[in-house]
Design a protein with these regions (language model features):
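Active-site-proximal beta-strand elements of phosphoester/diester hydrolases
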Residues: 23-33, 111-113, 138-148
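Acidic/histidine-rich helix-loop elements
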Residues: 28-39, 119, 147-154
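Sec-dependent N-terminal signal peptides
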Residues: 4-14
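Positively charged n-region of N-terminal signal peptides that target proteins for export
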Residues: 1-4, 184
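Metal-dependent phosphoester-hydrolase catalytic domains
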Residues: 62, 168-177, 187-276
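Active-site beta-strand/loop signature of hydrolases that rely on acidic residues for catalysis
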Residues: 24-31, 47-70, 101, 141, ...
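Boundary at the C-terminal end of the N-terminal hydrophobic targeting segment
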Residues: 16-20
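Structured beta-strand-rich core segments of catalytic domains in phosphoester-bond hydrolases
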Residues: 60-137
């Protein structure tokens, strides 16, 4: 039976910080050249404290992550930690790191899984994975920043290879079946590029509504590019609730300049049980 998604949009000024007891908010966020571009780290921390763990894309350097973690600790009086990929990936002209940040009292970092072995060079930036445990729920969290090009067919072609990414991380450990793939895919989930992934034998589903726009234009929200995918067979800890954080509150241009041109997206997971 298909899960019914409950989509909720968090407004930062009204939100209660943190997830309910026995639940966790697992998020993905394109941080727009974190560590390189001008950032309002205090406001960014006000946004991200709503989540328990966040997979970050577009990380320019370690210093940006450390500055963000420091600000989160000041803002919450809680300990935060991070993990950053050992090296950046991309092209000769532009490379970026992946990173994770999390609340130390709630999330346990188990180990890095490393980069997807992209033997056919199908991805401009190889996806990266790491293992975490929140309560009784352990999982592999894979993050990706897909190619963006004026030619949409290039983006579709890359997305068609996502099942290989899922299978790679799924097969690394026969005891760990919970694979969460989050990131900026630079395509709407309605695109044919996701047909292979969504027809996978493990019944992979998209957790973020196709109707929710996740990028920020100068005059409003624009595209549905950010998403989180799980297996409906294995990751029964997913409660069916997911959403995004309204980072702009109508201030689209300023948010693009000081925060990001994407919003964080997230899922809610039950942490009192583990079905592996």
């Amino acid at each position: 039976m298909k899960k019914i998604l409950t989509i909720f949009f968090i407004f930062v000024s009204m939100a209660v910080y943190g997830s309910p007891e026995g639940k966790a908010y697992i998020g993905s966020f394109n941080a727009l050249r974190l560590g390189e571009s001008k950032k309002d780290y205090k406001e960014l921390s006000n946004i991200l404290i709503l989540l328990d763990i966040i997979g970050l894309q577009e990380v320019s350097n370690r210093e940006g992550v450390e500055t963000l973690v420091d600000e989160l600790e000041k803002n919450t009086n809680e300990k935060w930690d991070y993990h950053i990929s050992p090296y950046p990936v991309g092209t000769k002209k532009y490379k970026e790191y992946y990173a994770y940040i999390w609340k130390k009292d709630k999330v346990n970092f188990i180990k890095p899984r490393g980069f997807y072995k992209d033997k056919g060079d199908k991805f401009i930036r190889e996806p990266y994975g790491a293992d975490f445990k929140i309560g009784e729920f352990d999982f592999t969290f894979v993050i990706i920043h897909a190619i963006y090009g004026k030619n949409k067919s290039v983006r579709i072609a890359e997305a068609m290879n996502l099942p290989k990414v899922y299978d790679y991380f799924q097969n690394l450990d026969e005891k760990e079946n919970d694979i969460i793939i989050g990131g900026d895919f630079n395509l709407s989930v309605r695109s044919e590029g996701f047909s292979n992934l969504l027809n996978h034998e493990d019944k992979i589903i998209n957790c973020i509504s196709p109707a929710m726009k996740t990028t920020i234009g100068t005059k409003g929200y624009a595209n549905q590019y950010d998403n989180i995918f799980i297996s409906e067979i294995y990751t029964k800890e997913f409660t069916g609730r997911s959403g995004g954080i309204d980072t702009a509150n109508g201030n689209y241009k300023k948010t693009r300049e000081l925060i990001s041109d994407h919003i964080p997206v997230f899922i809610e997971a039950d942490t009192l049980k583990d079905d592996d």
